[in-house]
A protein has these predicted regions:
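Short linear motifs embedded in intrinsically disordered, charge-biased segments
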Residues: 107-200
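Short, conserved micro-motifs composed of acidic
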Residues: 4-41
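Inter-domain linker/hinge segments that demarcate the starts of reverse transcriptase
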Residues: 1-2, 66
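Charged/polar positions within long, soluble alpha-helices
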Residues: 4, 70, 74, 98-102, ...
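Structured, non-transmembrane catalytic/binding cores
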Residues: 12-17, 22, 60-64, 113-121
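Basic, alpha-helical interaction scaffolds
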Residues: 32-102
């Protein structure tokens, strides 16, 4: 028995329904109050909507990137050392588009990826220390690291979803897919690119 009490006014309900036709859902009722239904929600700094398009999240990321790019340009105008520019990029720019990218990066639209890569390209021209990886490659690298961590942890919920080939234990069996949304998500992408050579 527990004595957990929910504040209905601060509680939100979001329904993930990918069917083409809009279907009515019964609202959640706590006590005598209905919980408010929302189309999007921000959780731990990540915004997701009821269709998992990640449009609001990617828009937020692009907005922040443009703000930080302004400061990078100012530092470059002041002839700050390239090493320090690179440090600023990793701390204040790279950290923005890599944060939780495993969740939203795969299904981010081409337009938004292009905007992110535009910021990376502009930064690359100013820093000139080393070639900066495109967003797509950063996403794949993060997926690969996460996959390796899962494979080492039998207690991870996704551990059983990773199936090794019976012919070669070093190869993974591709996951069966039905939707492009799942195709571009973390686990199928990580498995698909597990044996691919890394590229910049």
């Amino acid at each position: 028995m527990h004595f957990l009490k929910l504040n209905v006014k601060k509680t939100k309900e979001i329904v993930f329904d990918f069917r083409r036709k809009n279907n009515d859902h019964d609202n959640v009722v706590i006590g005598s109050e209905e919980v408010e239904v929302v189309n999007n929600y921000k959780y731990l700094g990540v915004i997701f909507d009821d269709k998992l398009t990640w449009e609001m999240q990617s828009n937020k990321v692009c907005s922040k990137l443009n703000q930080r790019l302004f400061f990078l340009r100012k530092l470059n105008q002041f002839n700050v050392d390239n090493t320090l520019l690179f440090l600023f990029f990793n701390s204040c720019i790279h950290s923005i588009y890599s944060f939780c990218a495993i969740a939203w990066g795969g299904n981010c639209s081409k337009k938004q990826k292009s905007r992110i890569n535009g910021v990376i390209k502009s930064s690359d021209k100013m820093i000139k220390v080393e070639q900066l990886s495109r967003f797509e490659n950063v996403f794949l690298e993060l997926c690969n690291k996460k996959l390796l961590n899962i494979m080492k942890d039998p207690t991870h919920p996704l551990f059983s979803s990773i199936v090794h080939s019976s012919r070669n234990v070093n190869r993974l069996i591709h996951i069966k897919l039905r939707t492009s949304r799942y195709l571009n998500s973390f686990l199928p992408t990580a498995v698909r690119n597990f044996h691919q050579p890394k590229s910049k």
